[in-house]
From Swiss-Prot:
Domain tr-type G: 65-245
Protein name from the UniProt record: Translation factor guf1, mitochondrial
Organism: Talaromyces marneffei (strain ATCC 18224 / CBS 334.59 / QM 7333)
Main location: mitochondrion
Function: Promotes mitochondrial protein synthesis. May act as a fidelity factor of the translation reaction, by catalyzing a one-codon backward translocation of tRNAs on improperly translocated ribosomes. Binds to mitochondrial ribosomes in a GTP-dependent manner.
InterPro entries: EF-4, EFG_III/V, EFG_V-like, EFTu-like_2, G_TR_CS, LepA_C_sf, LepA_CTD, LepA_IV
GO process annotations (BP): positive regulation of translation; translation
Entry similarity comment: Belongs to the TRAFAC class translation factor GTPase superfamily. Classic translation factor GTPase family. LepA subfamily.
Positions annotated to bind GTP: 74-81, 138-142, 192-195
Assigned EC number: 3.6.5.-
UniProt-annotated location(s): Mitochondrion inner membrane
Membrane topology of this protein: Peripheral membrane protein
NCBIfam families tied to this protein: lepA, small_GTP
Oxidoreductase in keyword set: no
Length: 663
């Protein structure tokens, strides 16, 4: 205030002293002195809102007949995300060369070159003088994220069936093709990486014809890396993929495709509007939970969140609520939303089912003092992935930790990487286990995910009718020269052969029914080793089968180390038990008393190792001829060892568990 008064006083005195000039200010003062460049927040927001409104006006003029929702179907690492980048550049959503894998938001996705979370982007494209609104959904290719894939397909009218020209059709191409075919999607065959020296387009096209019975005469040959022929894709999408069906005048019917957590806005939902319209201020209700919310904002991904006034039937976009949805468990993927008051007039969309965890691990902090940090890290990651189940558990050996459930082994590995890299967590992860079903004689059925809850031998004899384990139908593709080795591997893992087909003279598709427990025990690594890396694997659930499964425990001086117990098939208990005791012995320090390490199934010991104690030479000071004194001292030492064994606790360092649990 004082400064403003001084300026006013100076201006009044200066004008009183000087004659008033008739010249304009820009002639009196040089341009650089007269104008001070500045940028205000209000000005920036006004410019942003003006750009958004221009975009919104252009979208509002496009009827639903000129909407196209499509995705890319491919095996992992066949170039989906790179092709998505080229399409975004082609439609002006991003600048050429400005980013790589725009739709891969997670660090782990960029590091591994895989897509984990389904992402979407809206594009505007002018074709024959008319604007088209295109929604591209980049889906994961790996089997663990099949739920993400199937939900994404439900939002689409068609798909680009992308095949690597050098590698040809592979297992996940086959699995994802049938998933897309079952959803009734229009498929456009596309060959990628045709610029590679190893590319063989004719062989790849022949595989597509024989495997999928597709007409490949109009297949588009592209290079996502260089942009070769990518410009042909969008006109083909417009001409061949049908427009979504919907009516914006009907009551709202909206599918929840995905969700993620924002610190400031709560849970943000990725949605596909089938009928009606949604805008900020509307009150909506979930069919799965019955909970009601007020909409705070709606918008499209362009490629980041871009607010809009309304989302219409046929559009894919995001919404968040005000007050925000704070618990990500409320966002049930595949759920249907409608406006409050229309619940009885709207049919929920079919196909909603909760994702089921099929692989379980226990996670403990390397240092017990870091449990709170691990808990915070796990909770933050679970906010963005509702398919992970979390239960607290405690181990005598490792202290407090968590029992985590995942969709598959890659899902587990990605979560572990994110814990270590994004949150700096130092953790111990136990080997993965799968759930088992216990059918009791009274008809009660219990699913067990923690080996600690597995019934003991006496209960199994007296109360249990049967035990079951989950099976999967595995699809393997590989060159026929490795057929013998692959069949041998599958048989060694208790597999049951179903079909064997040649989809080219040298390529085989083999289908085997395998126990899921065998699959998570590094089956894929062994398969890659048997085929020099040429095999691909995909699988789907195949129900439960009666099995002779047992609980294998590690005992140290007859005390169970609960953290490493596993449920295994009886035929593998002895082999695995020998591996356990041998490996554990390497990492446990010698102590003043004997340490006995055993692997046990119930009361039966299947393997044993002994760590001898340190021994003091009590005879060092005795005369050689003093036999009676020698015997007396040795007996005394033996009695002392018995007392020490009775009261001594084996102290096992965390580093021993870390080394034992590492592969």
């Amino acid at each position: 205030m004082r400064g403003c008064l001084q300026v006013l006083r100076w201006l009044s005195t200066s004008t009183a002293r000087r004659p008033v000039s008739s010249r304009p200010l820009h002639e009196i003062f040089p341009k650089s002195e007269f104008r001070r460049p500045f940028t205000s927040t209000i000005l920036r927001q006004a410019q942003a809102s003006r750009n958004v409104s221009d975009l919104e006006k252009r979208i509002a003029d496009i009827p639903i007949e000129r909407f196209r929702n499509f995705c890319i179907v491919a095996h992992v690492d066949h170039g989906k995300s790179t092709l998505s980048d080229r399409l975004l550049e082609l439609t002006g959503v991003i600048q050429p060369g400005s980013n790589k894998q725009v739709l891969d938001k997670l660090d782990v996705e960029r590091e591994r070159g895989i897509t984990v979370k389904a992402q979407t982007c809206t594009m505007l494209y002018n074709h024959n003088g008319e604007d088209y609104l295109l929604h591209l959904i980049d889906t994961p290719g790996h089997v663990d994220f099949r739920a993400e894939v199937s939900r994404s397909y439900a939002s689409c009218g068609g798909a680009l069936l992308l095949v690597d020209a050098s590698q040809g059709v592979q297992a996940q191409t086959v699995a994802n093709f049938y998933l897309a075919f079952a959803q009734g999607l229009e498929l456009v065959p596309v060959l990628n990486k045709v610029d590679l020296p190893s590319a063989d387009p004719e062989r790849a096209l022949e595989q597509m014809r024989s495997s999928f019975e597709l007409d490949t005469d109009n297949a588009i040959k592209v290079s996502a890396k260089t942009g070769l022929n990518v410009a042909q894709l969008l006109p083909t999408v417009i001409e061949r993929i049908p427009a979504p069906v919907g009516d914006h005048t009907k009551p709202l019917r909206m599918l929840l495709v995905d969700s993620w957590y924002s610190t400031y806005k709560g849970v943000i939902l990725l949605v596909r509007v089938f009928d009606g319209e949604i805008r900020a201020g509307d009150q909506v209700v979930s069919f799965a939970t019955g909970l009601k919310y007020f909409v705070g904002e709606v918008g499209i991904m362009y490629p980041d969140q871009t607010p809009q006034t309304t989302l219409r039937a046929g559009q894919v976009g995001y919404i968040y609520f005000n007050p925000g949805m704070k618990r990500s468990k409320e966002a049930k993927i595949g759920d249907t939303f409608t406006k409050v008051g229309f619940e009885k007039k709207v049919e929920p969309l079919p196909g909603f089912e909760e994702p089921k965890s099929m692989v379980f691990v226990a996670a403990y902090p390397s240092d017990a003092d870091h449990f709170e940090h691990l808990e915070d890290s796990v909770n933050q990651l679970v906010l963005n992935d509702r398919s992970i189940t979390v239960q607290k558990e405690s181990s005598e050996a490792l202290g407090a930790g968590f029992r985590l459930g995942f969709l598959g082994t890659l899902h587990c590995s990605v979560f572990e990487d994110r814990l270590r890299h994004e949150h700096g967590a130092s953790i111990l992860i136990t080997p993965p286990t799968v759930p088992v079903k216990v059918i009791y004689k009274d008809g009660k059925e219990v699913t067990i995910t923690n080996p600690a809850h597995f019934p003991d031998e006496d209960d199994i004899r007296a109360k249990v009718a049967e035990l079951r384990e989950p099976y999967v139908m595995a699809t393997l593709t590989f060159p026929d020269e490795y057929l013998g080795k692959v069949i041998e591997l599958c048989e060694a893992n208790r597999g049951i052969q179903h079909t064997l087909e040649y989809f080219t003279p040298t390529q085989v598709i083999l289908k085997y029914e395998l126990p899921l427990g065998q699959l998570v025990e590094d089956f894929f690594g062994k398969l890659k080793g048997s085929t020099k890396g040429y095999a691909t694997l995909d699988y789907e659930e195949a129900g439960w089968k009666v099995s002779n499964i047992v609980k294998l425990q590690l005992l140290v001086n007859k005390k169970s180390v609960d953290a490493v117990a596993r449920i295994v098939h009886y035929s593998q208990a002895e082999r695995l038990g020998k591996q356990w005791v041998t490996k554990f012995k390497e990492h446990v320090d010698r102590q003043m008393f004997e340490i006995i390490i055993q692997a046990a199934v119930g009361r039966k010991i299947v393997a044993r190792e002994t760590i001898k104690p340190y021994r003091k030479d009590v005879l060092a000071k005795l005369h050689a001829a003093d036999i009676g004194r020698k015997r007396k001292l040795l007996e005394k030492q033996k009695e002392g060892r018995k007392r020490l064994n009775a009261v001594g606790n084996v102290v096992i360092d965390h580093s021993a568990f870390q080394a034992f649990l590492s592969k």
